[in-house]
Amino acid sequence: MKNEGKLDIIRPFGPAIGSTNIPKTLIDKINNFIDEVIKDKNKSKKFDWGKYLAGQVTQEIRLPNEIIDGELLNFLRESTKAFVEGLTDKKVTKFQLISCWVVRQFQNEYNPIHWHNGHI
């Protein structure tokens, strides 16, 4: 994939937005996990994260540590670091991912305007 891992910072209407390409290996890993979850009622229930999220969608699936740890966590860490250091004079010395999930959204479902906890 072209420019994989490169972060661009854009400001199309005010606040800065980080734009990057997620490596295909990560997309495949996440998609394979989601495919596995949606085929299994017990896993669908176990990883259902919808009750904690703002969206009015069919499925919001929490990613477990075995999916996050390693390449995905490193990608998110490096992208966040590039974003923060690209906008400020601050050096990122610590990164903690609180939670990570996939929104599986279908026609006529919506995700309302909302805020996320945490600090960048």
What is the meaning of each model-derived region?
Residues P12, V92-K94, H114-H119:
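A generic structural micro-feature
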